[in-house]
Regions:
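Short, Lys/Arg-enriched, Trp-marked, Pro/Gly-tolerant hinge/linker segments that flank
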Residues: 1-81, 94-106
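Short, well-ordered alpha-helices that flank and scaffold nucleotide-derived cofactor binding pockets
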Residues: 35, 39, 114, 140
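Basic/polar phosphate-binding segments, predominantly the helix-turn-helix DNA-binding elements
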Residues: 59-110, 127-152, 156
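Residue at a beta-strand N-cap/secondary-structure junction
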Residues: 71, 120-121
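Residue-level recognition of oxygen-bearing side chains
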Residues: 121-122, 137
Length: 158
């Protein structure tokens, strides 16, 4: 496998930072920049598996699934797992296959999709109650993940 230059490693991280629109996304992007720099320096990118860390991250995963609408920060999630943000981010990614920000976003969108189908609550109320800071961000993210707008999703109710 050809080794990427540090600048090539940072391109997807920079794109993610530009797309982030909340604290968790910004924090995560900053740590990914640091991780990419450390990886470029050491030449190693493999996270070491640790059963205790995995259990702690699993507890955080369950918490996010139970309350995805809660405002979260990477620092808070890492603290809850008794890990540094850097190690938490790496361990979370190894366990779940996605970053904490991506996982939270997916859970929020899943809950919103269920509510859109089961209730007549206004779309804006659902967006805010599920943890999105503004309606345009919700609409954009929903459309990207679900392939249609929230309104179109609701109209397709069975």
């Amino acid at each position: 496998i050809p080794r990427l230059s540090p600048s090539e490693m940072l391109l997807p991280v920079i794109a993610a930072a530009e797309a982030a629109d909340d604290d968790l996304g910004f924090e995560e992007a900053a740590l990914r920049v640091a991780a990419a720099a450390a990886t470029a320096e050491s030449g190693s990118s493999e996270a070491v598996r640790n059963p205790r860390r995995e259990r702690r991250v699993d507890e955080v995963l369950r918490r996010i699934e139970a309350e995805p609408e809660e405002p979260l920060t990477l620092w808070q999630l890492a603290h809850d797992a008794a890990m540094s943000p850097y190690h938490f981010l790496r361990t979370f990614n190894v366990i779940s296959g996605v970053t904490p920000y991506q996982f939270v976003l997916t859970q929020r969108l899943r809950c919103a999709a269920v509510r859109l189908r089961r209730t007549t609550d206004p779309i804006s109320a659902i967006a805010y109650e599920e943890g999105f800071n503004d309606l345009s961000t919700f609409n954009r993210r929903f459309r990207r993940i679900m392939g249609m707008t929230p309104g179109a999703w609701r109209r397709r109710r069975p």
